[in-house]
Amino acid sequence: MLNNAMSVVILAAGKGTRMYSDLPKVLHTLAGKAMVQHVIDAANELGAAHVHLVYGHGGDLLKQALKDDNLNWVLQAEQLGTGHAMQQAAPFFADDEDILMLYGDVPLISVETLQRLRDAKPQGGIGLLTVKLDDPTGYGRITRENGKVTGIVEHKDATDEQRQIQEINTGILIANGADMKRWLAKLTNNNAQGEYYITDIIALAYQEGREIVAVHPQRLSEVEGVNNRLQLSRLERVYQSEQAEKLLLAGVMLRDPARFDLRGTLTHGRDVEIDTNVIIEGNVTLGNRVKIGTGCVIKNSVIGDDCEISPYTVVEDANLAAACTIGPFARLRPGAELLEGAHVGNFVEMKKARLGKGSKAGHLTYLGDAEIGDNVNIGAGTITCNYDGANKFKTIIGDDVFVGSDTQLVAPVTVGKGATIAAGTTVTRNVGENALAISRVPQTQKEGWRRPVKKK
């Protein structure tokens, strides 16, 4: 069906006392992203014309965390219920648009479910998201007559008979803007909590002869809210299990799906293998036949075909061409780039550095602000000294250079093609092509020398 224009209201004013945190509840993260950000993203994907965020506690923290989102900030100075929260946003509703109500602490609601709810909303009526629970204790019950929804009764206000109802309200609903404003103006706080319930608009709509259509989510986890860290951790595992299942069905071999975390977006080729306890953050692309060892963290990086990343390696904002090998225990920091067939071994760190085709840095090395050519050997213990305490400087190493172990290259410095740097050398001046650079202290040997003896 053809949908009206739609705006979304996200309720995010709660303090989250049971989180025992100085951070507003909705800013606690699930899969590396604030819970409320999941909801904002869903609203935007659904095509919301406006997103109204109702906030209360921790407003400054919320505005700082969500500064890049195009939000209309609506203050709820007193937390007097969900109906009161919606009343604060009501002046911003257009009469001819639909208003979808969501919650900042219900992070896993899917766009697919919301679209079905939107499509199901009857003209002049309400679309309501409900679920059936074996134990509905504590939740508002859906009342019906002859199968038609007539209202919602909160648990504290329900009779014993009503408490036997298993269909409960999720709090998510959609209605026309003009209707919503009219119903919100009629709300009272005559209930056990002394609050203004948004759920009372269901009975108001029914009294006007309006139709209320109930829709069920695809998964219960979509409508589960978070009030404490235990609930958040459970939803985290639900989310991660769903992501792992999608990847497995798409051909990615996860050695143990229960020990894999996706905290962003993973684009992948064929025959990718990921071992246990791997974390993927941000936007990551893995080419064909990539292998990632246990304990690795990959963030905002592109890994080319046939690359192998050995255990306990951290890769962040890096680009690897085909057939590179890294680790174990290596660290590629932002700006690291490996060309085809390059190798970075254990305890090697790279930052804003390029390692050319077939070049190798096998172990115990720091390469920062460096441009390294093809077929270069970087010996163990090599350090590019790129920082003078105030500014960073660049090291340039040409093709086919051999850098011996325990070498320091004091930037800015250039080493020409084919040069050799002897082990233990401190390079402070440019080295010409095919030259040998050596700066060792001359070795002294004392024959018959005896070690000191400790005095008694």
Swiss-Prot record:
<keyword id="KW-0012">Acyltransferase</keyword>
<keyword id="KW-0808">Transferase</keyword>
<dbReference type="GO" id="GO:0009245">
    <property type="term" value="P:lipid A biosynthetic process"/>
</dbReference>
<feature type="binding site">
    <location>
        <position position="366"/>
    </location>
    <ligand>
        <name>UDP-N-acetyl-alpha-D-glucosamine</name>
    </ligand>
</feature>
<keyword id="KW-0511">Multifunctional enzyme</keyword>
<feature type="binding site">
    <location>
        <position position="227"/>
    </location>
    <ligand>
        <name>UDP-N-acetyl-alpha-D-glucosamine</name>
    </ligand>
</feature>
<protein>
    <recommendedName>
        <fullName>Bifunctional protein GlmU</fullName>
        <ecNumber>2.7.7.23</ecNumber>
        <ecNumber>2.3.1.157</ecNumber>
    </recommendedName>
</protein>
<keyword id="KW-0479">Metal-binding</keyword>
<dbReference type="GO" id="GO:0016020">
    <property type="term" value="C:membrane"/>
</dbReference>
<feature type="binding site">
    <location>
        <position position="380"/>
    </location>
    <ligand>
        <name>acetyl-CoA</name>
    </ligand>
</feature>
<feature type="binding site">
    <location>
        <position position="377"/>
    </location>
    <ligand>
        <name>UDP-N-acetyl-alpha-D-glucosamine</name>
    </ligand>
</feature>
<dbReference type="InterPro" id="IPR029044">
    <property type="entry name" value="Nucleotide-diphossugar_trans"/>
</dbReference>
<dbReference type="GO" id="GO:0071555">
    <property type="term" value="P:cell wall organization"/>
</dbReference>
<keyword id="KW-0548">Nucleotidyltransferase</keyword>
<dbReference type="GO" id="GO:0000902">
    <property type="term" value="P:cell morphogenesis"/>
</dbReference>
<dbReference type="Pfam" id="PF12804">
    <property type="entry name" value="NTP_transf_3"/>
</dbReference>
<feature type="binding site">
    <location>
        <begin position="386"/>
        <end position="387"/>
    </location>
    <ligand>
        <name>acetyl-CoA</name>
    </ligand>
</feature>
<feature type="binding site">
    <location>
        <position position="105"/>
    </location>
    <ligand>
        <name>Mg(2+)</name>
    </ligand>
</feature>
<feature type="binding site">
    <location>
        <begin position="11"/>
        <end position="14"/>
    </location>
    <ligand>
        <name>UDP-N-acetyl-alpha-D-glucosamine</name>
    </ligand>
</feature>
<keyword id="KW-0133">Cell shape</keyword>
<feature type="region of interest" description="N-acetyltransferase">
    <location>
        <begin position="251"/>
        <end position="456"/>
    </location>
</feature>
<dbReference type="InterPro" id="IPR038009">
    <property type="entry name" value="GlmU_C_LbH"/>
</dbReference>
<feature type="binding site">
    <location>
        <position position="351"/>
    </location>
    <ligand>
        <name>UDP-N-acetyl-alpha-D-glucosamine</name>
    </ligand>
</feature>
<feature type="binding site">
    <location>
        <begin position="81"/>
        <end position="82"/>
    </location>
    <ligand>
        <name>UDP-N-acetyl-alpha-D-glucosamine</name>
    </ligand>
</feature>
<feature type="binding site">
    <location>
        <position position="227"/>
    </location>
    <ligand>
        <name>Mg(2+)</name>
    </ligand>
</feature>
<dbReference type="InterPro" id="IPR025877">
    <property type="entry name" value="MobA-like_NTP_Trfase"/>
</dbReference>
<feature type="region of interest" description="Linker">
    <location>
        <begin position="230"/>
        <end position="250"/>
    </location>
</feature>
<dbReference type="InterPro" id="IPR050065">
    <property type="entry name" value="GlmU-like"/>
</dbReference>
<comment type="pathway">
    <text>Nucleotide-sugar biosynthesis; UDP-N-acetyl-alpha-D-glucosamine biosynthesis; N-acetyl-alpha-D-glucosamine 1-phosphate from alpha-D-glucosamine 6-phosphate (route II): step 2/2.</text>
</comment>
<dbReference type="GO" id="GO:0000287">
    <property type="term" value="F:magnesium ion binding"/>
</dbReference>
<dbReference type="GO" id="GO:0006048">
    <property type="term" value="P:UDP-N-acetylglucosamine biosynthetic process"/>
</dbReference>
<keyword id="KW-0961">Cell wall biogenesis/degradation</keyword>
<comment type="pathway">
    <text>Nucleotide-sugar biosynthesis; UDP-N-acetyl-alpha-D-glucosamine biosynthesis; UDP-N-acetyl-alpha-D-glucosamine from N-acetyl-alpha-D-glucosamine 1-phosphate: step 1/1.</text>
</comment>
<dbReference type="Pfam" id="PF00132">
    <property type="entry name" value="Hexapep"/>
</dbReference>
<feature type="binding site">
    <location>
        <begin position="103"/>
        <end position="105"/>
    </location>
    <ligand>
        <name>UDP-N-acetyl-alpha-D-glucosamine</name>
    </ligand>
</feature>
<dbReference type="GO" id="GO:0003977">
    <property type="term" value="F:UDP-N-acetylglucosamine diphosphorylase activity"/>
</dbReference>
<comment type="similarity">
    <text>In the C-terminal section; belongs to the transferase hexapeptide repeat family.</text>
</comment>
<keyword id="KW-0963">Cytoplasm</keyword>
<dbReference type="InterPro" id="IPR001451">
    <property type="entry name" value="Hexapep"/>
</dbReference>
<feature type="binding site">
    <location>
        <position position="423"/>
    </location>
    <ligand>
        <name>acetyl-CoA</name>
    </ligand>
</feature>
<feature type="binding site">
    <location>
        <position position="76"/>
    </location>
    <ligand>
        <name>UDP-N-acetyl-alpha-D-glucosamine</name>
    </ligand>
</feature>
<dbReference type="GO" id="GO:0009252">
    <property type="term" value="P:peptidoglycan biosynthetic process"/>
</dbReference>
